[in-house]
């Protein structure tokens, strides 16, 4: 039993790594499925458009899904048209762009994975580049090749050119090599940029490593208990209403947060060293409905895993 609990605790502690690993495997599988089942290079002048659509359209869809499935996106935008101060609070107008940047970086993980896997495979890039009409690119690709290369490059992916099979294969391998080089460049650039942004965020943090670890734990526990409390109160309220409806009697008072309390608790959290509230709900409970003082020492240590609500 202790061994099972130890294994479970290990997987819970490594859930971010496991999640990204699962996302990577899912991306690889999806790309292979697209390549084998759906992708058929037309081997015509439409190669460029066809290849680029298959390369970038799934990445765009994954980016939109990343925004759509991120709870912080909805916390940021819900009610902003009615009350713009929600996203541009007085004294902290730049907070919106800071949080939006964090959401965007989080949403970019899946699209970058897709582009990396697709470029390493090389199928989409090979089709797209074989349809180029740019004289500069044609000169680069067809350098040292027969003159037919300039006119029949779009047929290379299908192997239907009038050139020798060895030349056709060389062109295909050359295009695939270019694609793989771009793929590794994208992976290295994304990894380095991720390291830089993480280091910058930690360097700018005004809380210690241990306090930040406690903050993450608190935020996760609060999220879990909040969901359970929602279910509990929703069950109690629905049970009371149904009972009163069928028994045709007036309901007893049911304690619920006020509209102002819901609004205050739904705001994005900003950390104040003087008060050390670890969530917006924590601040509302301690201070009532009074908003925290907007001092100049507000630090936006909004860790992605700590504030995904």
Swiss-Prot record:
Pfam family, one: Ca_hom_mod
Disulphide-bridged cysteine pairs: 41-127, 43-158, 142-149
Extracellular side: 38-45, 130-174
Binding site for a 1,2-diacyl-sn-glycero-3-phosphate: 15, 32, 37, 102, 121, 202
InterPro entries hit by this protein: CALHM (IPR029569)
GO cellular component terms, A-Z: plasma membrane
Subcellular location: Membrane
The organism's place on the tree of life at top rank: Eukaryota
Keywords: Disulfide bond, Ion channel, Ion transport, Membrane, Transmembrane, Transmembrane helix, Transport
Membrane topology: Multi-pass membrane protein
Any GO BP annotation: ATP export
Membrane-crossing residue ranges in chain numbering: 16-37, 46-70, 100-129, 175-200
Gene Ontology MF term list: monoatomic cation channel activity
Segments in the Cytoplasmic topological domain: 1-15, 71-99, 201-309
Keyword Phosphoprotein attributed: no
Main location: membrane
Residues annotated as signal peptide: none
Self-association and partners: Oligomerizes to form undecameric cone-shaped channels.
Role noted for this protein: May assemble to form large pore channels with gating and ion conductance likely regulated by membrane lipids.
Recorded family membership: Belongs to the CALHM family.
Protein name (Swiss-Prot/TrEMBL): Calcium homeostasis modulator protein 5
Organism: Homo sapiens
């Amino acid at each position: 039993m202790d061994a099972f609990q130890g294994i479970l605790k290990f997987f819970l502690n490594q859930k971010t790594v496991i999640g990204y690993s699962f996302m990577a495997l899912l991306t690889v599988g999806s790309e292979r499925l697209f390549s084998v089942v759906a992708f058929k290079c037309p081997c015509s002048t439409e190669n460029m458009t066809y290849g680029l659509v298959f390369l970038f359209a799934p990445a765009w869809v994954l980016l939109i899904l990343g925004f759509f499935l991120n709870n912080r996106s909805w916390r940021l935008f819900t009610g902003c048209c009615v009350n713009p101060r929600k996203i541009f609070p007085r004294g902290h107008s730049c907070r919106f762009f800071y949080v939006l940047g964090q959401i965007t970086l989080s949403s970019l993980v899946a699209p970058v994975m897709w582009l990396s896997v697709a470029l390493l495979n090389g199928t989409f890039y090979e089709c797209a580049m074989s349809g180029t009409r740019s004289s500069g690119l044609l000169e680069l690709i067809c350098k040292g090749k027969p003159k037919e290369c300039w006119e029949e490059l779009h047929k290379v992916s299908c192997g239907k050119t009038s050139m020798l099979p060895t030349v056709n294969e060389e062109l295909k391998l050359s295009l695939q090599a270019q694609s793989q080089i771009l793929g590794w460049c994208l992976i290295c650039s994304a990894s380095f940029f991720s390291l830089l942004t993480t280091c910058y965020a930690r360097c700018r943090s005004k809380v210690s490593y241990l306090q930040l670890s406690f903050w993450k734990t608190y935020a996760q526990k609060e999220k879990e208990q909040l969901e359970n409390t929602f279910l509990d109160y929703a069950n109690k309220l629905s049970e009371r209403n149904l009972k009163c409806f069928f028994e045709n009697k007036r309901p007893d008072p049911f304690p619920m947060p006020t509209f102002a309390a819901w609004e205050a608790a739904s705001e994005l959290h900003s950390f104040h060293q003087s008060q050390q509230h670890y969530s917006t709900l924590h601040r509302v409970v301690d201070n009532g409905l009074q908003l925290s003082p907007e001092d100049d020492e507000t630090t936006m240590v909004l860790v992605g895993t700590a504030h995904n609500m």
